[in-house]
């Protein structure tokens, strides 16, 4: 028996987003005060992300008979991430050259006030590649969870799971406890997810109330170019990959529509991480692959952020009439491939990563970031949506590559004609 339409989550989220836009447009002062609703929802989700990743990865690895499989799955995932990320970067480069969203602005960099982006630049300068790698190692076991550092938690879970896999019967007792804990955590997620419409309303009302729909008008060409390129990437690039694996990308997008609407409302792909992991297990992906690929992808497979990075940098170059040679543009791609690894699923992280890229490519004025500061919040939604679809597809691909994809579940779930039971441990 189907739920009444007013009780369906994605319908509630859509209505909440529309109401949020209306409140932000007509009552901006009141709408800005709704910010705690969005922030509170994201904090509730982030509260359980670390423990869920830990439990999922530990039980997945502990259940693997061959520990070489962990390295194999991780290696395949990273290879896939780098290949697809390169496609995203190149597509952003090509689209900006073809559509030229920055041509005609003729802005003198000397007239730009860089104070507005000084804080982002400071954060960007504060971390090198070595710092990023060292940051993966937590100061203590507790600090990783306390600070919600996904990569640090993933490292702890990998070590924990590897030890449990070789600990015999004693290890099985601990694994059983952690598996039981995951039941509780996903139960908490189900409760929190019911609050998604409130969070989406608060975040959208704040965004429109603070920045206003009118702030979009001068930059509509850049926004349109970015959204169009992201759609092309999902439909064409990810569509071809999905077809090669044996599923339809549009049906996959429809399957995760609730998670995408949560992301749309909050502008944070992390807000839907627990639900995405649950949906992918229901889709037929093995729990061990989901546990390894999804958390890793949130730092290493940010397709939307990659498109945004090359497009934003070239837009600033076009707007300030800064000529770039092809060598400089190829260097830009290489630099972006590295700096984008530091972007997480948190709102605004992409802008900090952009500052890091411009800091390494001094030909383009860093003060040019001021041009897109006002609209970055509106582009954040598209970045997050593309990221979540990319990570979902990556998980299905790696599962199929490992021959751990249940095709019957996949086909039934995407058709929507069979009620899929929740996977074990959920």
From Swiss-Prot:
Organism superkingdom: Bacteria
Annotated transmembrane regions: 8-28, 44-64, 78-98, 148-168, 173-193, 222-242, 297-317, 355-375
Subcellular location per the Swiss-Prot or TrEMBL entry: Cell inner membrane
Keywords linked to the UniProt accession: Cell inner membrane, Cell membrane, Membrane, Symport, Transmembrane, Transmembrane helix, Transport
Chief subcellular location: membrane
NCBIfam families given in the database record: PRK01663.1 (NF002461), PRK13027.1 (NF009587)
Protein family membership: Belongs to the dicarboxylate/amino acid:cation symporter (DAACS) (TC 2.A.23) family.
Protein name: C4-dicarboxylate transport protein
Gene: dctA
């Amino acid at each position: 028996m189907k739920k009444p339409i007013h009780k369906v989550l994605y319908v509630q989220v859509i209505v909440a987003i529309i109401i949020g836009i209306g409140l932000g447009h007509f009552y901006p002062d009141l709408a800005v005060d709704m910010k705690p609703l969005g922030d509170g929802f994201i904090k509730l989700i982030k509260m359980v992300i670390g423990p869920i990743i830990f439990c999922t990865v530990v039980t997945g690895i502990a259940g693997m008979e061959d520990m070489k499989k962990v390295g194999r799955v991780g290696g395949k995932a990273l290879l896939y991430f780098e290949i697809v990320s390169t496609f995203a970067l190149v597509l952003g480069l090509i689209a900006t050259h073809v559509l030229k969203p920055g041509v005609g602005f003729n802005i003198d960099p000397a007239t730009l006030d860089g104070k507005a982006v000084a804080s982002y630049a400071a954060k960007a300068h504060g971390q090198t590649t070595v710092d990023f790698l060292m940051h993966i190692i937590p100061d203590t076991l507790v600090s990783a969870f306390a600070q919600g550092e996904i990569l640090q938690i993933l490292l702890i879970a990998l070590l924990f799971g590897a030890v449990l896999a070789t600990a015999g019967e004693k290890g099985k007792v601990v694994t059983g406890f952690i598996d039981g804990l995951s039941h509780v955590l996903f139960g908490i997620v189900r409760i929190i997810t019911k609050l998604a419409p409130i969070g989406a309303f608060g975040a959208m009302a704040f965004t429109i109330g603070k920045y206003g729909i009118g702030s979009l008008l001068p930059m509509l060409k850049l926004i349109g170019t970015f959204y169009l390129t992201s759609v092309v990437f999902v439909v064409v690039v990810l569509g071809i990959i999905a077809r090669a694996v044996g599923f339809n990308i549009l049906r996959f997008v429809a399957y995760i529509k609730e998670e995408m609407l949560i992301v749309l409302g909050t502008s944070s792909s992390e807000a839907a991480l627990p639900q995405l992991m649950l949906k992918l297990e229901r889709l037929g992906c093995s729990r061990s692959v989901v546990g390894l690929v999804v958390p890793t992808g949130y730092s290493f497979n940010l397709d939307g952020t990659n498109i945004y990075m090359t497009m934003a940098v070239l837009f600033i170059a076009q707007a300030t009439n800064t000529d770039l040679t092809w060598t400089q543009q190829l260097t830009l791609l290489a630099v972006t491939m590295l700096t984008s690894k530091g972007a997480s699923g948190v709102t605004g992280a992409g802008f900090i990563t952009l500052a890091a890229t411009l800091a390494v490519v001094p030909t383009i004025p860093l003060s040019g970031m001021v041009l897109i500061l006002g609209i970055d919040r509106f582009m954040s939604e598209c970045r997050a949506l593309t990221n979540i679809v990319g990570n979902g597809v990556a998980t299905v691909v790696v599962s199929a590559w490992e021959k751990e994809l249940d095709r019957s579940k996949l086909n039934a779930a995407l058709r929507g004609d069979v009620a899929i039971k929740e996977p074990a441990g959920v």
